[in-house]
Regions:
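RNA-contacting regions in translation and RNA-metabolism proteins
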Residues: 1-74
Length: 74
């Protein structure tokens, strides 16, 4: 289990990843599937890409095989 400080650090790191991903996905216009993230990580990416606008995120699959699909709406 993560401490509060670890969660804050991870959230900041994932916010940067989401910003980068949003830019790249908008640039290339191809949906991207991200695997290997726990529910906390997926939620942070969902929230950050939603805040950027112009992106659609969707979790697919079940359990340890759950993945995040991201596509540009532009």
């Amino acid at each position: 289990s993560r401490t509060a400080k670890q969660k804050e650090e991870r959230e900041a790191q994932l916010s940067g990843v989401a910003e980068f991903l949003g830019g790249r996905i908008a640039e290339i216009g191809v949906p991207v599937v991200i695997m290997g993230m726990d529910s906390f990580d997926r939620r942070i990416i969902h929230q950050n890409l939603g805040d950027q606008g112009g992106m659609q995120t969707e979790s697919e699959g079940f359990g340890t095989f759950r993945r995040l699909k991201v596509r540009s709406l532009k």
